[in-house]
Design a protein with these regions (language model features):
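Short beta-strand-to-loop element that shapes/binds the nucleotide-sugar donor at the catalytic cleft/hinge
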Residues: 78-83
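Short, acidic/polar
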Residues: 17-28, 144-151
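Short beta-strand segments enriched in small/hydrophobic residues
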Residues: 1-9
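CN hydrolase (nitrilase-like) catalytic-core segments centered on the catalytic cysteine
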Residues: 59-77, 145-198
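Alpha-helix N-cap and loop-to-helix initiation/capping positions
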Residues: 13, 17, 21, 53-60, ...
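Active-site catalytic loop in hydrolytic enzyme cores
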Residues: 84-155, 169-176
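Glycine/Thr-rich phosphate-binding loops of Rossmann-like dinucleotide-binding domains
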Residues: 13, 47, 170
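Active-site beta-strand/loop signature of hydrolases that rely on acidic residues for catalysis
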Residues: 3, 18, 26-52, 69, ...
Length: 198
């Protein structure tokens, strides 16, 4: 399976600009016969703690991604945030080229040192989906520091993805932890980080 990792420079709290960039990357990947394109954490808003800026509903976002996937005949994995009641949810969804939602994961470990846990609700389960013969489990950023969930996922998954908004100051940790999770669990780990300034 040919996989592309889209390291986007995210436009801060600007859904329209970011979704246009997602579409551009997706079209390019499709033209190169990529079967799965993966985007970073919160790639439609940037890593924001301002949940009032999250105006699109989960249904609206998923419908938009479905259309991009179907129109380009490509599977898409993408991180986004939504407002749910008084808190947010940090999500990673995988949508098939036929428009089916294969996985819709909510981050289990919000980044406590940045106060994410006070603003975003945590998830309570691991999602595993299948594309072709590969089983895939998506995780998000700070989840990478918790090896137990990777061990659980690796009992079934061939591939684990980690969409992130990981800062340059801790780049060594990012690379070391991705390698460690792959070595520990003997599976493929795809890390997709954003670029640019937060």
């Amino acid at each position: 399976m040919l996989v592309a990792l889209a390291q986007m420079d995210l436009a801060w709290e600007d859904f329209n600009t970011n979704i246009n960039r997602v579409e551009t990357f997706t079209k390019e990947a499709s033209s190169k016969n990529v079967e799965l394109i993966l985007f970073p954490e919160m790639c439609l808003s940037g890593f924001t703690n301002n949940i009032s800026s999250l105006e699109k509903s989960e249904d609206e976002i998923i419908e938009t991604i479905k259309n991009i996937a179907v129109n380009n005949k490509i599977n898409i994995g993408l991180g986004f945030a939504i407002k749910v009641d008084k808190k947010g949810e940090n999500k990673y969804t995988i949508i098939s080229k036929s428009g089916e939602v294969l996985a819709n994961y909510t981050k289990i470990h919000p980044f406590t040192f940045g106060g994410e846990d006070k603003i975003y609700s945590k998830g309570d389960h691991i999602d595993i989906c299948k594309i072709n013969e590969f089983k895939i489990a998506p995780f998000i950023c700070y989840d990478l520091r918790f090896p137990e969930i990777f061990q659980i996922a690796s009992k079934e998954a061939h591939i684990i993805t980690v969409g992130a908004s990981w800062p340059k100051a801790r780049e060594d940790h990012w690379i070391s932890l991705l390698k460690a999770r792959a070595i520990e669990n003997q599976c493929y780990i795809f890390g997709i980080n954003r670029i640019g300034f937060c």
